[in-house]
Amino acid sequence: MSYKSGFVSIVGRPNVGKSTLLNQVVGTKIAIMSDKPQTTRNKIRAVLTSEKGQIIFIDTPGVQKPRNKLGEFMLKQALTSLDEVDVLLYVVEANSPIGPQENYLLKTLAEVKTPIILVVNKIDVVKMIEAQTLARQIESRLKVAKTYYISALNGTGVSELVEGIFELLPEGPPYYPEGQVTDYPERFIIAEYIREQILHLTREEIPHSVAVVVEEIKPRENSNTVYVSAVIYVERESQKGIIIGKNGQMLKEIGQRARLEIERLLGSNIYLDLWVKVKEDWRNKDVWIRNFGFTEFE
């Protein structure tokens, strides 16, 4: 049996389950998950290696009209290189009708030459006939190589999807060593874990006004504890107060929850030191967008 390998980009509207699917496929938590749109800001690269070959997945930010320079960056991240990967996974929600954002995405994908697999997600919350009706509507407007019905949350249909991806990949060597599941640095993943807890614990404009920068990861001498220092950046003083909370309780809760995730990642005890700082209107300033890590890791 020939060994296959290639790159697969996951595209779709915000909050359709792209990150959940990515984590389900590789069997570990690479991308953070939240019920809020635009959780994913960078392309997240994850690797699945099996006897059949190797798939490098790229989970892109959800496609929607940008509202600021950060939004423009995220849209560019989502749409660039669509013709440079081997397969596109176009993820839609089984329980959502086609709307303006989906129409925009359909028009964009219609111009792409890369083979497209339609992935109808969240079949656990609708009747199959509804999911199939949505799929037929999309297939009438877009050339689709294969269609799969899945639940990224509980794993239904995911193994069949992976088999379908391998069928479309070319023969090739492994790009990453066996056992490696991502090529993103630890600092990036730790920052994402902290941001995930902010997404879960805060409301309104706070989640999308936040950037997290990990400044230091250092094992403590004569101890099995790793010291991690990170700064949470917001755009206004009022947001800083919300993140810190009354008597520091919100920041403490964010830190406690994030620490558990980071300890699982690093396999050791963690002392997490969190700070909150203000950078006014950073989402509209190119220099801060770059400084906060919103660039491709090459």
Swiss-Prot record:
GO terms for cellular component: cytosol; plasma membrane. It is found in: Cytoplasm; Cell membrane. The keyword Cytoplasm applies. Residues 38-42 are annotated as: G2. Residues 202-280 form the KH type-2 domain. GTP binds at residues 12-19, 59-63, 121-124. Pfam families: KH_2, MMR_HSR1. Gene3D superfamilies: 3.30.300.20, P-loop containing nucleotide triphosphate hydrolases. It is a peripheral membrane protein. Residues 150-152 are annotated as: G5. InterPro entries: G_ERA_dom, GTP-bd, GTPase_Era-like, KH_dom-like_a/b, KH_dom_type_2, KH_sf_prok-type, P-loop_NTPase, Small_GTP-bd. Residues 121-124 are annotated as: G4. One of its GO terms (biological process) is ribosomal small subunit assembly. Residues 59-62 are annotated as: G3. Keywords: Cell membrane, Cytoplasm, GTP-binding, Membrane, Nucleotide-binding, Ribosome biogenesis, RNA-binding, rRNA-binding. Residues 4-171 form the Era-type G domain. Residues 12-19 are annotated as: G1. PANTHER family: GTPASE ERA, GTPASE ERA, MITOCHONDRIAL. An essential GTPase that binds both GDP and GTP, with rapid nucleotide exchange. Plays a role in 16S rRNA processing and 30S ribosomal subunit biogenesis and possibly also in cell cycle regulation and energy metabolism. Belongs to the TRAFAC class TrmE-Era-EngA-EngB-Septin-like GTPase superfamily. Era GTPase family. HAMAP family: GTPase_Era. Monomer. This is GTPase Era. It comes from Carboxydothermus hydrogenoformans (strain ATCC BAA-161 / DSM 6008 / Z-2901). The gene is era.
